């Protein structure tokens, strides 16, 4: 008798993706973040669904409906904080996943990598629109400032902004459409994640050595499922520590004040996971230039496969490139810190130097390091 998981049309798909999938024997814990991102997405969709049952997307009642969820709904406070901190967790896993991809040269799987970049843009859009929904001060002013950046686009900019707003300012129409998009986009993210997996399974996973591993493959289950399960337990432990003990650690106190179009907060800033890009935006005095730099700070990932000069895929045995990689990580952390600071000296010049370094490391220094390393290895 044949095994059902190998013959049943639905089970066969699951089998090929999660059970009998040939996996490199030497993949490390850095390969856990794909499954953890899947878990984060499930947590966000589930908690978001329950929040949507009690939320009203109206400028007069949005803030009080969130208060009602926290005070009157059974475990509403838990669902709300799980959703808010789940977004932070999502981005922590996302950035670690991308960092792993850069370090081990996973960007050579072009389709998988490009779909990953689309997933990153979709997730950022979803998170931004979700931040607007509680209709606190930072929600309102964040939405106003970030959507207003589109007015820098020549000729169509102003019309585009008013079209997105649904009027001449951020108002009821804006909140309503953001609620609709914020609800619908995660399902598109889930669909794109499936395509991401589809392309990954066409080539098979990369591994820390960055060399073909067809001669040394093991089945995904039970080895990598057990490993993923450990990652999930550790992630949930960290997540619930954050949710139950420090729920407001990553939030902005200004968002506990209802939105007031007549009162601008002293420091308008997005959530922590956008601060590095916000710092790059602010470091360029020209509005259009800033917007281009903002988009390029993410889109630059798409250039990685085309600008690499090294003949080794992974950075594991390339000390100069390793140094540059960790310099890049430090630079992103500095940008994140600067993005949360007010625009005044010395924060301005630090932001400009860090922004310049961000692009210089990726576009200039890493390709040069690759050439030097090739020469050192006499390749």
Curated annotation (Swiss-Prot):
How does it associate, per the subunit comment? The cytochrome bc1 complex contains 11 subunits: 3 respiratory subunits (MT-CYB, CYC1 and UQCRFS1), 2 core proteins (UQCRC1 and UQCRC2) and 6 low-molecular weight proteins (UQCRH/QCR6, UQCRB/QCR7, UQCRQ/QCR8, UQCR10/QCR9, UQCR11/QCR10 and a cleavage product of UQCRFS1). This cytochrome bc1 complex then forms a dimer.
Q: Does the keyword Metal-binding apply?
A: yes
What InterPro entries has UniProt attached to this entry?
Cyt_b/b6_C, Cyt_b/b6_C_sf, Cyt_b/b6_N, Cytb/b6-like_sf, Cytochrome_b, Cytochrome_b_C_euk/bac, Cytochrome_b_N_euk/bac, Di-haem_cyt_TM
One GO MF term on file is: metal ion binding
Per UniProt, subcellular location reads as: Mitochondrion inner membrane
Question: Which species is listed as the source?
Answer: Dipodomys gravipes
Protein name from the UniProt record: Cytochrome b
Per the entry, the cofactor note is: Binds 2 heme b groups non-covalently.
- Note from the entry: Heme 1 (or BL or b562) is low-potential and absorbs at about 562 nm, and heme 2 (or BH or b566) is high-potential and absorbs at about 566 nm.
